[in-house]
Amino acid sequence: MAKHRRVFEYLHGGIESGALKPGDRLPSEAELGRLFDASRITVAKAVLDLQRMGLVTRRPGAGTHVLSQQRATGRTFGLLIPELGLTEIFEPICLGMARTGFAKPDALLWGSASASAGESAREAEQMAQSFIAQKAAGVFFAPLELAADRDAVNRRIARALDRAQIPIVLLDRCYMPFPERSDHDLVGIDNRRAGYMAAAHLLGMGARRLAFLGEPAAANTVDARIAGFHEAMRMHGAAPERDPAWRGSAQDEVLVRGMLEALRPEGIVCANDLTAAQLMQTLLGLGVRIPEQVRIVGIDDVKYASLLPVPLTTIHQDCAGIGVAAMAAMLERLEHPELPARDILLPVRLVVRRSCGAQLKSRSGDERGLAWE
């Protein structure tokens, strides 16, 4: 057993058994270090785990003390995710929250709106009011994305929760336009890096003319991905004269044909896997061969990405890990409301499948170090 885990089990066992009572001061980090022959960093990691579970609190200059059970248990958190069920990433994020040890003393109230965009906006505001009425300890909020009045609705929801003094942790995206920032913690991925990685991979495959395609009313995560896409083009000396980032439906055959004629792209980065799947169907319907004529990369790595007509190369995000990090952020926010707003960004990784044309390079002996799936 790792040393920090031994320290954690020792302290956690003392709290659970009652040997360490509410208000009791934990042994100092120096004392615990001597007891377990562990460094102060190792001890601090164990204490931080207890703090994230809401079992202890740090008092500057006074040490770490056990919280009362009334404060440590029985809290209710709201999940305000209007597009739960419509966007695949949110279900594993929520499951990550529910399964983490940090959440065991607490309850999660699931709220979703799976109707039309307009109805989803109304239902989202109603859910926020419901969480306020139930005196939720905190709310995990994934801002509306595709509704026409999404900006106004998202701001009204945030203001209502702020007035009720209910902490908010944003999931996946901010409700402010990129690169602006709200006053709330956000847990997601580094979207700029994801866009950069997707474009850089296609450039590394030999494609020089690239395009980017995303929905016109998408979340600000898409703006960040476009920024990363542009950066990769500049860094690789492939920046075109005209903007290669297009906004529109990947199912619009006229738009897709226009993009092909205007840009003659050898590779296309899609804002997400859903857009990539729709684009793939449209291109195949137009007689375009993938990846021989056009290479495609998505972002998300949803379940069906490997099952598409041409298995999709994509950027994988750790959705369960986002859920765990979001719960930890909420508990820390409750303990330290004075902390500045933070972006907690989990790493992403490239998953190589057929749509990027890597197998074409493999046949010619040019493939180096690719992580195939």
Named regions from a protein language model:
Residues 6, 10, 14, 184, ...:
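Flexible loop/turn connectors
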Residues 7, 174-177, 181-212, 250-257, ...:
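Hydrophobic alpha-helical segments within soluble ligand-binding/sensing domains
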Residues 9-13, 17, 31, 35, ...:
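Alpha-helical recognition/docking segments in bacterial nutrient-uptake
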Residues 19-58:
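N-terminal helix-turn-helix
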Residues 25-28, 58-72:
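Short, Lys/Arg-rich nucleic-acid/phosphate-binding segment
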Residues 88-104, 194-197, 220-239, 278, ...:
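Short, solvent-exposed amphipathic alpha-helices that sit
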Residues 101-118, 212, 230-250:
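Short beta-strand elements in bilobed, periplasmic/extracellular small-molecule ligand-binding domains
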Residues 196-238, 342-356:
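An alpha-beta-alpha
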